[in-house]
Amino acid sequence: PRGLVFFLHGNRGNLETWTTGLDFYRRVNFDLFIVDYRGYGKSSGKIESEAQLHADVRAAYDAIAPRYRGKPIVIYGRSLGTGLAVRLARDVAPRLLVLVSPYTSLVAAGLRRYPFVPEFLMKYPIRTDAMIGGVTSPVLLLHGSKDTLIPASDSEALRDLVRAPVELVLIDDAGHGDIHR
């Protein structure tokens, strides 16, 4: 393989739902490594804290990355996985960081969807906006122009906070769940 795509899925995804794009990765000769968070897919356990979630992602990365020493590694986050991808990319500096439908923070995303829920009840704030300025790798942001779950304005806000080379691509007529079509 030429390199690795380290994939962090969204809330509705798991290892099984993302294997549909495998042909693309085969064609470009990149291996795909998908992390299933605790309690997702066939992974057991329960997410107890944001710190635990970040630690799990880092442990998975540390287990696979040495096999690709000297080869490009792309960290790819989708929706929920974007905040986790930003934190990891900030710490390990991959060749490229790809964020699809990213949020500025989970608290902000949650309050937009459920404005009646007190902010302190949001268990995992995952402040992407507070971390992305520390990323030194190039960043590609992809967002559906008709995303009603996480608005494209979140990608625009994140783009403005990135200090590394950054590109934002808005996908016309795509929403949150169909951006990969």
What function would you assign to each model-found segment?
Residues V117-M131, T136-S137:
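Active-site nucleophile elbow and catalytic-triad environment of alpha/beta-hydrolase enzymes
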Residues A174-R181:
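Catalytic histidine-centered segment of alpha/beta-hydrolase-like enzymes
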Residues H9-N11, V74, F116-M122:
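Short, flexible loop segments at the rims of nucleotide/cofactor-binding pockets, characterized by
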Residues G134-T136, L141-H143, D147:
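Short beta-strand/loop motif that positions the catalytic acidic residue
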